[in-house]
Amino acid sequence: MLNDFTGADKVYIACGCTDLRKGIDGLARLVQQQFELDPFTNTLFLFCGRRRDRIKGLYWEKDGFILLYKRLEQGAYQWPRSESEVKTLTQQQYRWLMEGLQIEQPKAHRPVTGLSAV
């Protein structure tokens, strides 16, 4: 379910390690206080533990929170290590993360913006 989660308008990841003993209330408080974001929006917030083999997702679904949890049996997520930072992911970066790849792919084509017809 977490690999193909498409219900959210935005996806944020909390860089660095998060204490995954936190539940819904603790993670929602972290989103509000540390990152100054609103957890009551159509947004998926992702958190990773120290060993990088487990992630938790927090998602508000109009009438309550959903807490998603995934533990890899082998391998680890390529999680950004910079502490106390939150990053917005594109859908492509989210797929890369769920596939075990780094969210910054140096060989990927970058989107082109600001073009005009000749």
Where would I find each of the regions flagged by the language model?
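Polybasic/polar functional segments that serve as interface/processing modules
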Residues: 1-118
